[in-house]
Amino acid sequence: MPSRRRHSYTVGSPATTSSNYSNTTFTDRSFPTTPARTSTDTTTSIARRISGIFINCFTPPDSVSSNYIDNSKSSSDNNIRSRRSSTGSSSVQRSYGNANETEHTRFTFDEIYDATKNFSPSFRIGQGGFGTVYKVKLRDGKTFAVKRAKKSMHDDRQGADAEFMSEIQTLAQVTHLSLVKYYGFVVHNDEKILVVEYVANGTLRDHLDCKEGKTLDMATRLDIATDVAHAITYLHMYTQPPIIHRDIKSSNILLTENYRAKVADFGFARLAPDTDSGATHVSTQVKGTAGYLDPEYLTTYQLTEKSDVYSFGVLLVELLTGRRPIELSRGQKERITIRWAIKKFTSGDTISVLDPKLEQNSANNLALEKVLEMAFQCLAPHRRSRPSMKKCSEILWGIRKDYRELLNTSL
């Protein structure tokens, strides 16, 4: 029988909506980095109460029919104009082997246009806030994913250009096994296209919905969680300056044929402040996806690496329950997944939140409790109470090790 040990946690109130906008994406207007009041990060236990208030953090305009809302008014970026190409192509470096075996090539708009047969829906593999993603096989036989920016975004050209260049600049400086690889970009008239690694097995959300026809077992889910944690840790600790992804969610996690995770979509990424400057956060209007947004960021406009930690906590709950962060089709008590999960957890009924597609056994039940415990620490309302992504990676590594050992002994 599973343990019915009672727990008590406080979690931050998620961004919710009162209408059908569960995938709504916020956009931002940037402000200069400003120092915050000094506060000492101490290791604290999660407060001994459950937050009873879940704030409706935004109300989408009635006139918006898309799931993505663009209110960006960023200042113009001279870099964008200087990087436009009259031929509609950009010179990039592509590596197909090891670091010493690189090929230099040039993407052109015509090549991509022909390969997708005028961006035919038959080549479409995804849709997001940035635009549409297509699978492309070019003349050299290599397969890529190309992200074509929405034309509607160009009504606010400065904001669209800034977001496009943000993703390019971020992708160009990161290299990690669990991050989608960047190959280049194309600008041709009003067309803006990113060329990135093609990851063959769809999104994590597709697999949790069983759209791919196979249920992810607990071992695979722990691998995915660990991969994502390592990728975010790399962004926070091993890039200079650190990078805040700002849109960690299941539809931005791609799976390889071996079910290893790759974090994608850096359109909302921001550079964290240089610690030498004395700044502790970036002041910026909100950008992200409803249900995953850090409530402290929502109320203070102060973005830090701990905002990614909060989103990661939501992702962990999603991995374990199989549910989306916001499920408007459910009753009021179950509509917000993290609120429902923590109530079950604190009442000692943890096993009831396990994805019904997973078997209830001793190994799965233990992993469920341990990962949920860490997830709720990530969901603490105040960033100082959340663990770092490095700490999350270490904890997940240990949970996965214990899970494998318990699974092997029970066979």
From Swiss-Prot:
The keyword Cytoplasm applies. Its EC number is 2.7.11.1. SMART domains: S_TKc. Residues 1-44, 66-99 are annotated as: Disordered. The modification Phosphothreonine is found at T108, T284, T289. Residues 16-44, 66-95 have a biased composition (Low complexity). It comes from the Eukaryota. Interacts with calmodulin (CaM) in a Ca(2+)-dependent manner. This is Calmodulin-binding receptor-like cytoplasmic kinase 2.
